[in-house]
């Protein structure tokens, strides 16, 4: 069974777009505008991150074992994804995980 990447692709494009907008306005003197744009970047990052790990979990469940993703933490999930060559750099994904946790609180 093939996985549908459309939602992930859309969330990554939205994140890239919001980052580009942030960089084009980051020197603006309207701090409320910068804060609002920054919040949009954070929200788009959170969405892309959530879509990413859920897709990784689905792939592992479909290709390794039906409950693989349910037996581990997200960090463990990223380690498994590295073992199966779904991601190149496990460390950066753990950093994404930590960043996601920091944006939530």
Task: Annotate each PLM feature.
Residues 1-105:
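Solvent-exposed interaction patches of small proteins and small membrane subunits
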């Amino acid at each position: 069974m093939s996985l549908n990447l459309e939602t992930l692709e859309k969330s990554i494009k939205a994140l890239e777009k919001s980052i580009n907008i942030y960089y084009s306005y980051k020197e603006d003197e309207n701090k409320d505008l910068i804060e609002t744009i920054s919040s949009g970047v954070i929200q788009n990052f959170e969405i892309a991150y959530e879509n990413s790990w859920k897709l990784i979990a689905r792939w592992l469940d479909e290709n390794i074992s039906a409950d693989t993703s349910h037996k581990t933490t997200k960090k463990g999930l990223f380690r498994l994804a590295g073992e199966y060559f779904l991601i190149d750099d496990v460390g950066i994904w753990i950093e994404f995980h930590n960043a996601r946790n920091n944006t939530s609180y």
